[in-house]
Amino acid sequence: MTTTPASPRTDLTRRRMLTAALAASVGAAVPISAARQAWAASTATGPVKLTLPAPTGPHPVGTVPLHLVDTSRPDPVAGPGHHRKLMASVWYPACKTKDLPRAPWMTQGALRAFLADAGFPLDPALGPLTAAHVGAPVHQTGHRLPVLVYSHGAGSHRGDHTIMVQELASHGYAVVTVDHTYDAFSEFPDGRLTVPAEVPPFLGPRDFTTDIRFVLDVVEGLAAGHNPDVDGRPLPQGLLGALDPQRIGAFGWSKGGTATALTMLADQRVGAGLSIDGPMQPTITTDLDRPFMVMNASFTRAAMPDVAEFWTRLRGWRLNIRADGAIHKTYGDDATLIPQAGEILGMTNQQIQDMIGILDPARAVRIQQAYPLAFFDLHLRHRRGHLLDGPNAAFPEVKFIP
């Protein structure tokens, strides 16, 4: 397939944003060298563990990694002779979790590469643990689980919206997250690491879309009782046959948000989609007749003609919301993790706000827990609440854009 050039890239990598924030000005209150010294000093007596907020749903959460190979196509970056290889994770409502370890936010190898890319000292021990228990049995409800597929942003990784993912799983969804190899920090079972490509060919949103459609095939295989892991690693008890291929939604951040829209246009298996500040480039000029929600921050309809054009193409149920004070990284895990890391680094409040916006991180967490759940509950489970009806006193910062 042909890859979509990623330059000029609307999606911002963490490296660029972290560097810009840490070196905000020549006279910054905390120079990068001093910040690194503060980080090293803080970890000298033991690793500082960052934390993620717990999900609010009634179920414990389980997770399992999957090593996937799409033998139907060559890798668009590695080229002919190399099938497309992906790392994914399935998150789900679980049971019997008491003695099972919690999954890390990223594997140590991937986190080490991620921190090096950001310019931080290599201490993967600081990475947070998620709420999910590795390999826990699936909670049996007597019916199959609705499925969501998550696509990350450019230069990121499949765990970048873990708060949102584990929230949905705690409320009864199976969520499949995928690393888009060569535009992600990804570690394979044999220890091989891949990082975002620095030279062409770059992956574009359409390449992400092809990955997502392959993951949809994997979902159907799991639903039919087939283990898709190429290494044959055992799956959690009850996972085979637990997913409902007739109730599938998709969501993504930034480039992943654009890919979500493109996937829905290409594949009828996705019944509802959510874009988290996706730039909608390349311009989408095809109508979409299924439910779609847009959570804007930096890439608004007013600022981005491509987003405005996409909005006009939504012919089914649609909703556009934006939280006051939100920017591109507000709706993800960074809103929680960057303030914690900033405190360790000695960053100023202004430097932190340059990265995640001025919205209170605790409010950002509640927004990213509540609104995606309400959207998918409405369209995949037909559970109608009132959160999506209009402005809500519990969320005064969330504006509905007509």
Give the residues covered by each predicted segment:
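Alpha/beta-hydrolase-fold serine-hydrolase catalytic core, especially in secreted/extracellular enzymes
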Residues: 48, 53, 334-335, 339-402
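N-terminal export leaders
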Residues: 14-21
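Alpha/beta-hydrolase active-site loop
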Residues: 197-242
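Domain-level recognition of soluble alpha/beta enzyme cores
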Residues: 41-148, 351-361
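Short glycine-enriched nucleophile-adjacent loop
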Residues: 257-266
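N-terminal secretory signal peptides
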Residues: 1-12, 24-27
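Short substrate-entry loop that stabilizes the transition state in hydrolases
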Residues: 139-145, 150, 154-186, 302
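The feature captures the conserved acid-bearing segment of alpha/beta-hydrolase catalytic domains
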Residues: 272-331
